[in-house]
C-alpha cells in the first residue's frame, strides 16, 4: 500500500519511522515532512493545511492510507474530503472527520459534550462577551483557568494569579485577538489540583484500545516555570500495571467519548486523546484532542510492539477489535529541542 503521513513535526517523524517498517507499506510519502522523514520516505512540498494540495497528491501518487498528524487538517475536513475521492477505491484515513474533530477544535463543544455524556470534568462557563466574562471573574465560585475556545497550538490555556491578570488575559484574547479567532470565545473553568496524565487510544468508531499512560511537560522553563507550550518533553511507561490502569481509564474517558460521538452522528476514527487530571475526587478530563499527542507520540511509539500500519488499517476499516495491540514492557522519554523565542514566536512557518 502507498501511505501518506500529513504533518511536519517530530510527531510525524515518529509516525513515519514506525510506518517505514510496517508490513503494509509500499511507498511512504510525507506532506510536507522534515529532514528526518526525508530518510524514511519521499517528502512532498505540500503544507499540512493545504487540503486541495493533499487531495491532488493522494490521486497523483495513488495513496491508499492517509495518516494525519496535526489537528488543523482534520478540523478543515481532510478526512471528509478523502471519502469523496476515487469512488471505486476511496483512500482510507486514520483521523476523524471535522464534526468529530470538534472535540478538540472547540473547547466549548468539548465541555458541553462531556456534560451531556456524564464524563467527569471541571465546572465551567462559556463567554462570548468580554463584559460578562469580566464581571464573572470578579467573584468566581472557584479558582479558575481561562481557555481560548479555538485551536491555539497548545498555548491557549492561562492560569491567572489575580483578577487584574485575568482581566488582562481576557482583553488580550477577546479584544486584542492575540490568538486570532481562537480567543473570541473563552471557557472559564474551575482550576483543578492534581497530577496530569495523557491518555491516548486507538479508536475505530466503535471500540478503543488504550496506549500506555504518558505525561507531557508543558511549561517552557526548568522547574515547571514559564508559559505553557505545546510540550517540552514527555515520558511513557508500558509496565503491566500501567497498561491495566490505562485501559480502565480508557473505558470511561475514551470509550465513553467514542460512543457519545457515534450517538451524535460523528463516529471517531483515529487516535483519541484525553488530557486527565488525578484529583482527590477521582480522575477528571481537562480536554480532548483528536490526534496523536506531540510530544507524547515520540515517547509512545518506540514502545509499540504491534505493526502501526496494521493498527491504523484496522481502525480505518472499523475492525480494531480483531487486532489486539501489543506493547513491549519498558519506559521511554523524549525531550524537545525548541528554536529561540518559542513559544512566543511560533506558527506554521516558525520551526519549533
List PLM regions with ranges.
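ATP-dependent carboxylate/acyl-activation modules
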Residues: 4-5, 223, 280, 330, ...
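Active-site "cap" helix and flanking loop/linker of ATP-utilizing ligase/carboxylase catalytic domains
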Residues: 250-272, 289-352
Amino acid at each position: 500500500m502507498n501511505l501518506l503521513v500529513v504533518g511536519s513535526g517530530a510527531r510525524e517523524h515518529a509516525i513515519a519511522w514506525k510506518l517505514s517498517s510496517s508490513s503494509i507499506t509500499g511507498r511512504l510519502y510525507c506532506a510536507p515532512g522534515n529532514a528526518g522523514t526525508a530518510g524514511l520516505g519521499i517528502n512532498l512540498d505540500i503544507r499540512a493545511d493545504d487540503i486541495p494540495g493533499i487531495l491532488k497528491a493522494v490521486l497523483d501518487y495513488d495513496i491508499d492510507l492517509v495518516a494525519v498528524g496535526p489537528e488543523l487538517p482534520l478540523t478543515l475536513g481532510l478526512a471528509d474530503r478523502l471519502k469523496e475521492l476515487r469512488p471505486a477505491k476511496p483512500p482510507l484515513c486514520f483521523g476523524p472527520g471535522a464534526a468529530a474533530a470538534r472535540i478538540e477544535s472547540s473547547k466549548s463543544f468539548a465541555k458541553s459534550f462531556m456534560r451531556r455524556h456524564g464524563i467527569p470534568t471541571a465546572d465551567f462557563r462559556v463567554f462570548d462577551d468580554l463584559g460578562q466574562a469580566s464581571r464573572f471573574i470578579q467573584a468566581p465560585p472557584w479558582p479558575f483557568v481561562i481557555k481560548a475556545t479555538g485551536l491555539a497550538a497548545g498555548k491557549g490555556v492561562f492560569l491567572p494569579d489575580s483578577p487584574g491578570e485575568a482581566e488582562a488575559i481576557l482583553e488580550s484574547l477577546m479584544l486584542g485577538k492575540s490568538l486570532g479567532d481562537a480567543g473570541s470565545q473563552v471557557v472559564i473553568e474551575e482550576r483543578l489540583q492534581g497530577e496530569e496524565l495523557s491518555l491516548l487510544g486507538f479508536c475505530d468508531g466503535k471500540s478503543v484500545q488504550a496506549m500506555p499512560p504518558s505525561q507531557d511537560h508543558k511549561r517552557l522553563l526548568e522547574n515547571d516555570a514559564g508559559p505553557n507550550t505545546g510540550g517540552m518533553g514527555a515520558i511513557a511507561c508500558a509496565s503491566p500495571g500501567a497498561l491495566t490502569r490505562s485501559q480502565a481509564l480508557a473505558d470511561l474517558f475514551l470509550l465513553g467519548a467514542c460512543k457519545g460521538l457515534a450517538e451524535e452522528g460523528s463516529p471517531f476514527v483515529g487516535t483519541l486523546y484525553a488530557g486527565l487530571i488525578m484529583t482527590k475526587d477521582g480522575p477528571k478530563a481537562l480536554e480532548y484532542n483528536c490526534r496523536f499527542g506531540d510530544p507524547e507520540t515520540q515517547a509512545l511509539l518506540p514502545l509499540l510492539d504491534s505493526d502501526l500500519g496494521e493498527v491504523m488499517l484496522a481502525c480505518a476499516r472499523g475492525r480494531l477489535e480483531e487486532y489486539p495491540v501489543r506493547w513491549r514492557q519498558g519506559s521511554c522519554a523524549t525531550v524537545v529541542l525548541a528554536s529561540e523565542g518559542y513559544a512566543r514566536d511560533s506558527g506554521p512557518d516558525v520551526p519549533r
